[in-house]
């Protein structure tokens, strides 16, 4: 397969145009989001959905997340990532396969139907995780495009995927919220340097390869600005796979947590990685022939046992 988005192959970074649509469906009155929201996603590369879950559903999700964090021994050890300088849990991967509540969340029509509309296809979960940024100790995560990594290290061929961050704690301007460069999703910023074997073992704690150069980042930030979407628990932040994003550390006493779901179009199934010989492991990237997600409707608390 032709590599339409080469990266980590040259000595200098390049800004290349995006070759894929952002919104893959024509908006109609039957769409799960408004015309204004669809236009905003196309223009900015992200939107924020508020008040789509009830207070009971949010509490239900928070309890499920707390159960995952409280009993790491019950989880697959490979799926747990700790902070760089401590044993504090930073992320738990494959939550949709390790928690019935998170599996039901991933399949919920309020999320999955939006993904199906924006991607113009049936979808499956490429990756899922619970992110936790503890108070005082939560470390930063540097600027990056998810697609650059998914393309080079996982073999995702096209920009036909998106992420949804379901906030499980209040995201404020101060506790290390997600930051995005709106509009950056229309530029593919290549990275410099060959990727070492088993790069994921270190990159999940601190990424050193597949990192954008400062000059290009500055140009994107000056061109588009930087936004930090915030919200109360239950808020959902959707963003395109190529949107440049990152987060600061959390030196406040207020932890930040979110359930993170990556939806990929079934037609965009992973191929051989475009930049490495050995693909990343199963809990970071769903390989093989994907089955379309079976969308479920109704309140979370009525359809999943506690």
Curated annotation (Swiss-Prot):
Binding site residues for Fe cation? 144, 146, 245
Q: What effect is documented for mutating residue 280 to A?
A: Strong reduction in the production of 5-hydroxyectoine
Describe the thermal dependence of activity: Optimum temperature is 40 degrees Celsius. Active from 5 to 50 degrees Celsius.
The cofactor required is: Fe(2+)
Q: Where does the entry annotate site (Important for ectoine stabilization)?
A: 150
The EC number on file is 1.14.11.55
Q: Which reaction does it catalyse?
A: L-ectoine + 2-oxoglutarate + O2 = 5-hydroxyectoine + succinate + CO2
Pfam families, sorted: PhyH (PF05721)
Name the UniProt record assigns to this protein: Ectoine dioxygenase
Q: Does the keyword Iron apply?
A: yes
Look up keyword Iron and say if it applies.
Answer: yes
Gene Ontology molecular function terms on file: 2-oxoglutarate-dependent dioxygenase activity; iron ion binding
Q: Point out the coiled-coil segments of this chain.
A: none
The UniProt annotation places L-ectoine binding at 127
Q: What is its quaternary makeup?
A: Homodimer.
Binding of 2-oxoglutarate: at which residues? 133
**pH influence on activity:** Optimum pH is 8.
> What is the similarity comment for this entry?
Belongs to the PhyH family. EctD subfamily.
Q: Which PANTHER family match?
A: ECTOINE DIOXYGENASE, PHYTANOYL-COA DIOXYGENASE DOMAIN CONTAINING 1
Q: What does this protein do?
A: Involved in the biosynthesis of 5-hydroxyectoine, called compatible solute, which helps organisms to survive extreme osmotic stress by acting as a highly soluble organic osmolyte. Catalyzes the 2-oxoglutarate-dependent selective hydroxylation of L-ectoine to yield (4S,5S)-5-hydroxyectoine.
Instruction: Quote the InterPro entries the UniProt record gives.
Output: EctD, Phytyl_CoA_dOase-like
Q: What does the cofactor field's note say? A: Binds 1 Fe(2+) ion.
Q: Which UniProt keywords apply?
A: Dioxygenase, Iron, Metal-binding, Oxidoreductase
Listed Gene3D superfamilies: q2cbj1_9rhob like domain
């Amino acid at each position: 397969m032709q590599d339409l988005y080469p990266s980590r192959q040259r000595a200098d970074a390049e800004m290349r145009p995006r070759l894929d649509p952002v919104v893959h469906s024509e908006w109609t009155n039957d769409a799960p989001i408004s015309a204004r929201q669809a236009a905003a996603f196309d223009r900015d590369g992200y939107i924020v959905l508020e008040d789509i879950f009830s207070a009971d559903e949010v509490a239900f999700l928070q309890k499920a997340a707390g159960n995952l964090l409280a009993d790491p021994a019950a989880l697959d050890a490979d799926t747990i990532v700790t902070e760089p300088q401590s044993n504090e849990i930073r992320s738990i991967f494959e939550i949709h396969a390790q928690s019935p509540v998170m599996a039901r969340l991933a399949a919920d029509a309020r999320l999955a139907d939006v993904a199906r509309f924006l991607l113009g296809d049936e979808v499956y979960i490429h990756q899922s995780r619970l992110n936790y940024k503890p108070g005082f100790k939560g470390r930063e995560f540097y600027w990056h495009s998810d697609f650059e990594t998914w393309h080079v290290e996982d073999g995702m061929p096209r920009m036909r995927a998106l992420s949804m961050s379901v906030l499980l704690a209040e995201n404020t301007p101060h506790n290390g919220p997600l930051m995005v460069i709106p509009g950056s999703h229309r530029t593919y910023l290549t990275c410099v340097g060959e990727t070492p074997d088993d790069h994921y073992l270190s990159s999940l704690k601190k990424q050193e390869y597949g990192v954008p150069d400062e000059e290009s980042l500055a140009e994107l930030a000056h061109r588009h600005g930087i936004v930090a979407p915030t919200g109360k628990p239950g808020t959902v932040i959707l963003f395109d796979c190529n949107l440049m994003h990152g987060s600061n550390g959390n030196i406040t006493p207020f932890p930040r947590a979110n359930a993170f779901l990556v939806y990929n179009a079934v037609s965009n199934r992973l191929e051989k990685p475009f930049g490495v010989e050995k693909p990343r492991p199963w809990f970071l990237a769903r390989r093989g022939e994907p089955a379309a997600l079976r969308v479920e409707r109704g309140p979370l608390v009525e359809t999943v046992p506690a």
